[in-house]
C-alpha cells in the first residue's frame, strides 16, 4: 500500500475524503494522538522541536540586524536619534509609480524604505552597538547560533543522543539548572556586558574584543569588591547634564540606585539597570541551589508539596499528590508556563512605556504605541492558551484517585460556586459600566453635559499618591515630606523617582480622572468575562451537569444533535474559541485607552481625553473617527503619501476580518451543497474535467470552520488596528 499523508495516523491516511488533509494538518503537532507513540518518544520529539524553534528565532533576529546594517541608517541615526527616522529595510518595488517612490524615500535614504517602529535602533544603541560592522557581526553570530540549534535538534533525535524519560522527569535538576543557568548566569552575563561595554559606550568609550582587557570599567577595578567597600561602585554617577554617548557630564559609577530617568534620553539610568541585573543574578544563583538532586542537599519538591496540608477544619488534603500529577502531565506544565509567560508579557507592555529602559525610545511615540499594542495582544493569546492546555490536562491527564480531596479535586468540587461568582462579577461590571456610559451619552445628546455621572477614581489616586505623586493633595507615605518612608529614601533613590513621578513629560503614573475610572471598569468587565469563559471551559472539560461523560469525547468534540440535550458550545475547545473573541475585545479596549490617553498627552491637549472619554460617542467620534482621517487620506484625488500603505492595510484588514464571518455564520450543509455543485460543473466542463482528484471534497467540520473563522477574525482585527495605530501616530508625530 502506498504511503499517504498523514503518515502518523493510518486511520486518517485511509480516509477517502478531503477530511484526510485538514485533519492531518490539525493533528500534525498533537504527538500524543499519533500511531505508535510512546511517552519517551513524545518527550524526545518535543525536546528536539524546541531547538527548531530556537533556530527560527535566531534566524529572524539575525535578519533584523542584517537588513538594518545593509539597508538602514543606524550610523546616521546615532548622530541625531530624535530627528532622524530609523530605517528598517529598503522597499524593492514600490508600486504606483513615481509618487510612491517619492513618498517612501525618507530617513536620508537614496530610495524607498520602510521606517522601523520596533525600537531595535534604540535597543542596539543603548547596549553599546555603534557601527554597521557591529550589526553585521551580531547578525553572523546569530546565524551561527541558528545553525547550531538546527544541528542540536537533529542530534537529539539520533539514538545515541536521545535523552531518556527519567532525564525529562527529573524536575529538581531541571529547576536548578533553569534557575541558576538560564536566569542566574545569563543575568550575571548581561550585567557584565552592561558594565564592560554598554556603560562605557554611553560615556563615549568604545570597548571591543581588541581592548576589552585593557579598559577598566571602574577606575579602581575589583578593589572595592575585594575590600568589601561595595558602596564605592555607586559613587560619582553620571550627572543630570550628561550627554548620552559622550564623556560630557559622565561619571564613573557602575552600580547605582539613582531612581527616575536620565534627563536627556528619558530612559532609566544604565547604571541602575546594571545594578538591577546583578541583584537578579544573585537571587537566582542562590535559588538554583535550592532543590535536592544527587548531592543530597536542599529541598525535595515532592516533600514540600506533601507537607503543604491545612492545619485543620474541612480544608482537604492540600497539595498531596500534586507532584506526580504535574510531573507526569506535559499539558499541566505547559499551562503553568503559558500562564506565567502571558502575565510577564503583559507586564513587559506596561513597563516598556512607563519605565523605558532604552535611550530615546520614550520620545519615539509611534514605536511606544506599537510595542505596547504588540505585547498586549501577544499576552492575550498566550494567556488563553494557558487555559486551553489546562482543559486538555483535565481531559487527558487528570486522575481523580491520585488527587483525592487535594486542591485540584476541591476546585472541581466547588466549580459551580467559582463559575457563578465570576458570572455575577461580570454581570455587575457590565451593567453598571454600560449604564454609566449610556447615561452620559444621553446627557450629552440632550445638551446637558453637567448632568453626567462622573466618578473620581479616588482609591487609584490614593495609591498613586502613596508612591509620591503630589497632584491630588493626599499627604500620604511618599507624597508626605515628613513621613518615615520619605526620609529613609531621601538620600538614595527618592529624588530621581519623585522627579519622574511628578513630571508630566513621561508616562509614569499619569494623572487620572472620571474617564479613566469608566474605561478601567470596562476593561475589568472584559477581563472577568474572558476569565469566566476560560475557567468554565477548563473546569467543565471532563463533565458538566448537562453532559457528565465528556472524557471520552476529548477536547474538541462538535455539536452532536439533540440526543444528549444538545452538545453545541460545550466542549472545552468551544470555550477557548469563545474566550478568544472576548480576549480580543478586551485588549481592543486596553489599547484604545492607552493610545488615546497618550496621543492627547503627547499633543499637549489632555483635556480632550478627559472631556470626551466619559461617554461612548466621545470614543467613537473623538478617538476612532478623528484619528482615522489621516489613514483614509493615504490615497486621495491629489495622489498618495507615505501613509498609503497603512490605508491599504486598513482596508485589507477589514476584508480579512469580514471574511471570518463567512465561516462563523454558516452551516455545513450550505458549503457541502456548493461543493457538490462545483464538483459536478467541473466534471462536465471540457478541459477542466481532465483534472481529477482522489479525495471526495467535503465541507469543513464545524470545529474546523470555527477555527478558520476565528483565525480570520483575529488576524483581520489586529491588522486593522495596527494600521490605524501606526498611521494615526506617525501621521501626527512623524
Swiss-Prot record:
Q: Which GO terms describe its biological process?
A: photosynthesis
- Please tell me where this protein is predominantly located: plastid
Q: Which residues form the signal peptide?
A: none
Q: Which residues cross the membrane?
A: 46-69, 135-158, 175-199, 273-291, 330-353, 369-395, 417-439, 517-535, 575-596, 643-665, 707-727
Task: List positions binding chlorophyll a B1.
Answer: 654
**InterPro entries, sorted:** PSI_PsaA/B, PSI_PsaA/B_CS, PSI_PsaA/B_sf, PSI_PsaB
Cellular component terms (Gene Ontology): chloroplast thylakoid membrane; photosystem I
What class does this enzyme belong to in the EC scheme? oxidoreductase
**Record localization:** Plastid, Chloroplast thylakoid membrane
Which residues does [4Fe-4S] cluster bind? 559, 568
Q: Which GO terms describe its molecular function?
A: 4 iron, 4 sulfur cluster binding; chlorophyll binding; electron transfer activity; magnesium ion binding; oxidoreductase activity
Q: How is the cofactor bound?
A: P700 is a chlorophyll a/chlorophyll a' dimer, A0 is one or more chlorophyll a, A1 is one or both phylloquinones and FX is a shared 4Fe-4S iron-sulfur center.
Tell me which residues bind phylloquinone: 671
What is the membrane topology here? Multi-pass membrane protein
**Swiss-Prot/TrEMBL catalytic activity:** reduced [plastocyanin] + hnu + oxidized [2Fe-2S]-[ferredoxin] = oxidized [plastocyanin] + reduced [2Fe-2S]-[ferredoxin]
Residues annotated as binding chlorophyll a B3 are 662, 670
Q: Which PANTHER family match?
A: OUTER MEMBRANE PROTEIN, OMPA-RELATED (PTHR30128), PHOTOSYSTEM I P700 CHLOROPHYLL A APOPROTEIN A1-RELATED (PTHR30128:SF19)
Function, as annotated, reads: PsaA and PsaB bind P700, the primary electron donor of photosystem I (PSI), as well as the electron acceptors A0, A1 and FX. PSI is a plastocyanin-ferredoxin oxidoreductase, converting photonic excitation into a charge separation, which transfers an electron from the donor P700 chlorophyll pair to the spectroscopically characterized acceptors A0, A1, FX, FA and FB in turn. Oxidized P700 is reduced on the lumenal side of the thylakoid membrane by plastocyanin.
Q: How does it assemble?
A: The PsaA/B heterodimer binds the P700 chlorophyll special pair and subsequent electron acceptors. PSI consists of a core antenna complex that captures photons, and an electron transfer chain that converts photonic excitation into a charge separation. The eukaryotic PSI reaction center is composed of at least 11 subunits.
By its UniProt entry, which HAMAP family does this protein fall under? PSI_PsaB
Q: What is this protein called?
A: Photosystem I P700 chlorophyll a apoprotein A2
Q: Which source organism does the UniProt entry give?
A: Agrostis stolonifera
Q: What is the lineage of its organism?
A: Eukaryota, Viridiplantae, Streptophyta, Embryophyta, Tracheophyta
